[in-house]
């Protein structure tokens, strides 16, 4: 797969039932573009996740006073690595994504499709998605998103617009009844899944 320069996500479930989900980022455009000469570590540009007065971010989000820079404060983040468990505490699904502000909508929609609508993990990840980030007040939709749903959204006052490349990559693992693990990696940006006995 091609190398990307921003966020990465990994979901892991062990045969013993332990789960780890990690979303990590150096932010946009290969971090700060700087590498430590002594360690070789690439430096991030997470300061860009704070709001700056009168400057919209790369995703079209306007500045918010709640996200202005303050000493000791962390910037707002869209990452949402998630582990779902059943009533007994057993892992049912491990999921997360990359893709800036689209992470939250992609993870929540994919999770809903699996947990509420009974889709398998591949169907849930591969199906077309919607995205709404509150501001600007519009719903972006992927090519082939069901027109019937879009028309219903328009009928209740939503503005819709087609999204170009959707840019969010979801990785998920679902435990099936009987304990079998199934996994899928989003076709939208390339990658792979693997399993070991």
UniProtKB/Swiss-Prot annotation:
InterPro entries given in the database record: GGT_peptidase, GGT_ssub, Ntn_hydrolases_N
Keyword entries, A-Z: Hemostasis impairing toxin, Ion channel impairing toxin, Platelet aggregation activating toxin, Potassium channel impairing toxin, Secreted, Signal, Toxin, Voltage-gated potassium channel impairing toxin
Cell cycle is among the record's keywords: no
Record's signal peptide: 1-6
Any one GO MF annotation of this record: toxin activity
GO BP terms: glutathione catabolic process
Expression (tissue specificity): Expressed by the venom gland.
Example of a GO cellular component annotation carried by this entry: plasma membrane
Subcellular localization(s) per the UniProt record: Secreted
Record-linked Pfam families: G_glu_transpept (PF01019)
Family: Belongs to the scoloptoxin-11 family.
Record function comment: May act as a voltage-gated potassium channel inhibitor. Is highly similar to the subunit beta of SSD14 which, when complexed with subunit alpha, induces platelet aggregation and hemolysis.
Protein's name according to its UniProt entry: Scoloptoxin SSD20
Species for this entry: Scolopendra dehaani
Lineage: Eukaryota, Metazoa, Ecdysozoa, Arthropoda, Myriapoda
């Amino acid at each position: 797969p091609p190398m990307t320069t921003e966020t990465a996500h990994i979901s892991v479930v062990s045969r013993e039932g332990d789960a780890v989900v990690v979303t990590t980022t150096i932010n946009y455009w290969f971090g700060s573009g700087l590498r430590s000469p002594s360690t070789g570590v690439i430096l991030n540009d997470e300061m860009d996740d704070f709001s700056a007065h009168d400057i919209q971010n790369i995703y079209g989000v306007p500045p918010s006073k709640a996200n202005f820079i303050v000493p000791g404060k962390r910037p707002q983040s869209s990452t949402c690595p998630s582990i779902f468990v059943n009533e007994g505490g057993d892992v049912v699904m491990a999921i997360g994504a990359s893709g800036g502000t689209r992470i939250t909508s992609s993870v929540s929609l994919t999770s809903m499709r699996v947990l509420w609508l009974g889709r398998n993990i591949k169907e849930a990840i591969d199906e077309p998605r919607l995205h709404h980030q509150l501001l600007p007040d519009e719903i972006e939709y992927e090519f082939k998103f069901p027109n019937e749903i879009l028309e219903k959204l328009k009928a209740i006052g939503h503005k819709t617009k087609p999204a170009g490349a959707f840019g969010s990559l979801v990785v998920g693992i679902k435990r099936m009844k009987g304990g079998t693990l199934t996994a899928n990696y989003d076709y939208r940006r390339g990658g792979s899944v693997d399993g070991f006995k």
